[in-house]
Regions:
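Short, surface-exposed amphipathic charged segments that create phosphate/polyanion-binding patches used
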Residues: 62, 162-163, 183
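Conserved catalytic-core segment of NTP-binding enzymes
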Residues: 4, 80, 87, 92-178
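A short acidic, often aromatic-flanked loop/helix-cap motif at beta-alpha or helix-coil junctions
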Residues: 53, 181-183
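N-terminal phosphate/diphosphate-binding loop that engages ATP/GTP or pyrophosphate donors
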Residues: 1-68, 72, 77-80
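Surface-exposed, flexible loop/turn segments at secondary-structure boundaries
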Residues: 17-20, 125, 156, 183
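Active-site donor-binding loop signature of nucleotide-sugar glycosyltransferases
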Residues: 14, 180-181
Length: 183
């Protein structure tokens, strides 16, 4: 949407788990999609400073390969991306309350990069609780919550429209849209 509006926008996934090893190193499908959707096209290492093979929580994936996720590499990658684009969209890692390392939370990353937060809510059973708790945690962390987007995870969900309507009524932040399944 940013690019369609004429903005130079790039994506970043600071920590990527579930990577596969190829001739060019560790690669993650989500990070590759972000790289392909970015304009200008950034270096892959800037899109994804921390690649991990295990498809699990970032702190666990990092520990399995003896790495401690730290702010400096992510800050440097973000600054390089920001120097070449109007907007850098940073994808979250494992959910708002998933720690990046001992004593290093998602909120610290968002605060250091001076980013507003956009909550993406996967529409499924349990999404009402998840979204309300996440919104509360983001606001309690003192961050700007720009709004939320509903994400249709499956083509047909029993009570999907009811979930979406209830989210619109119960969340304090504005709904910025609904992503149809497959987009």
């Amino acid at each position: 949407a940013l690019r369609a509006g004429g903005r130079r926008a790039v994506g970043m996934k600071p920590v990527a788990s579930g990577c596969t090893l190829g001739v060019d190193g560790w690669r993650n499908d989500d990070a590759l999609v972000l790289q392909a959707a970015s304009l200008p096209t950034p270096a892959y290492a800037q899109v994804k400073p921390y690649p991990f093979p295990a498809a699990t929580a970032p702190q666990i994936a990092a520990a399995q390969v003896g790495v401690r996720v730290q702010m400096a590499p992510m800050q440097a990658a973000f600054e390089a991306l920001a120097a070449s684009a109007d907007v850098v969209v940073v994808e979250g890692v494992g959910g708002w309350m998933a720690p990046l390392a001992d004593g290093f939370e998602q909120a610290q990353l968002a605060r250091a990069l001076q980013l507003p937060v956009l909550l993406v809510v996967g529409l499924k059973l349990g999404c009402l609780n998840h979204a309300r708790l996440s919104e509360r945690a983001i606001l309690d962390d003192g961050l700007q919550l720009a709004g939320w987007i509903g994400n249709q995870l499956v083509p047909q969900l029993d009570y999907g429209s009811e979930y979406f309507e209830l989210l619109q009524r119960s969340l304090r932040s504005p709904c910025l849209g609904l992503l149809p399944h497959g987009d």
